């Protein structure tokens, strides 16, 4: 989980970074419909978490964060995701260490989900790594846009993914 500080003096996006982290603080949301046909019989939520994490780990800009006020890039990321407690109708945020081998990741995901899905606390699994990003799903709601704003002084740089109910499109 190495974090590599970025030298702002040689950073090609220095001017843009300083503008948006300073005077032009903003957030943005982007909605992308994803064709999941190829997932076939795979369980949707863990498969999507794995695919998102693999993608985040391939794109350095998705691994950028501020640590103690220093801009840098993590070597790798792990998903922090929600599990729903059907009895209390609440969710908990847990995390699973990413494994590039889908079968190994799925086994770890299933262990963590089974262990923490009955929890009523917000974050029942301890030691969420700092190199994690958020994923959630509302499988009961079909939507084509969502907007999430964090009020933290504009320093949240890591991506947040929210998925909805799968739907058929274009035939």
Regions found by a protein language model. Name each.
Residues 71-73, 127, 169:
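A short beta-turn/loop motif at secondary-structure boundaries
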Residues 62-95:
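Small-residue-rich loop/turn and linker elements
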Residues 38-60, 171:
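Acyl activation and transfer enzymes in specialized metabolism, enriched
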Residues 1-32, 130-171:
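Flexible, Gly/Pro-enriched loop and linker segments at secondary-structure and domain junctions
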Residues 26-28, 46, 77:
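Residues at beta-strand starts and edge strands
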Residues 85-143:
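Helical lid/core segments from catalytic subdomains that handle acyl or acyl-like groups
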Residues 33-37:
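Helix N-cap / beta->alpha transition motif
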Residues 59-68, 118-122:
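A short, aromatic/hydrophobic, helix- or strand-capping loop or linear motif
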